[in-house]
Amino acid sequence: AGYDWPSLVKKDGDELFDHYRHTLEELGRQKGLLGLIFNKSQNKFQDPAKLRRLIVDLIDKETWVSMSADVKGDAYEGLLEKNAQDTKSGAGQYFTPRPLIQAIVDAMAPTPGETISDPACGTGGFLLAAHDYVVKHYPNMTSAEKKKLRGESFKGWELVQATARLCAMNMLLHGIGSQEFEPIAVGDSLAADPGERFDVVLTNPPFGKKSSTTI
C-alpha cells in the first residue's frame, strides 16, 4: 500500500529515492500490462533533486487524467516514431511506418467481434491501427462489443523485452487491455504453437533480430 503518485509527490531527498525504487518494484509485480511495463525497471536518476523536479515541477503540474486516451496515446506514438527515425538507436526495426500500417489495415477491414493478432508486434502499430479502424467504421457498437474490443480482441507477441515494454505502454495509453487480459506476450511466436487461433493476422516480420528458429 502507498505505492502511488500522491505518495511520490510527498517525498523528498533519500526518502524519495527509496520510495521511488520500491514503487517501481511493486508495479513490476502487478498483473497485466502494468507488470510488463515495469518489469525489471530501474531508477536511472543519480540526484534526488532532479527526480523531485521531474515529479513535482513537470509531471505533477499537468492534469493527465483529464486528457483523452487519444491525446496521450498519440503523443506517445509521436515519441516512438521520433526514436525510430534515429538511426543510432536501432529502434526503427521495431517501428513500421504508420501510413504502411494503415494501408494494410484498410485492406483487411477488421470488424467488431474478430480477434486480431500480430506475431511480431514491435511497438504495437498494427494492433492499434486495427482498433482505431473498428472504432471509426462501427460507431454504433454496443457497450459489450466495445468492452470486448478493448479487452479481448488483440494479442501480440514480441521477442525483445524492452520493445514489448514500449508496446505495452502504447496499448495502455490507448485504453487497450486490462488487468485480467494481457494483450502482449514476451517471447518467440514461432517457437511453439501458442494454442490460440485468430480471425485476422497483421504483421511486419522482423529483419533485425536473429533467431535460432528456422522456417
What are these regions (language model features)?
Residues 1-112, 175, 179, 183-189:
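Non-catalytic, mostly N-terminal accessory regions of nucleic-acid modification and defense proteins
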Residues 90-203, 208-210:
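Conserved S-adenosyl-L-methionine
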Residues 213-215:
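A mobile, often basic/glycine-rich helix-loop segment
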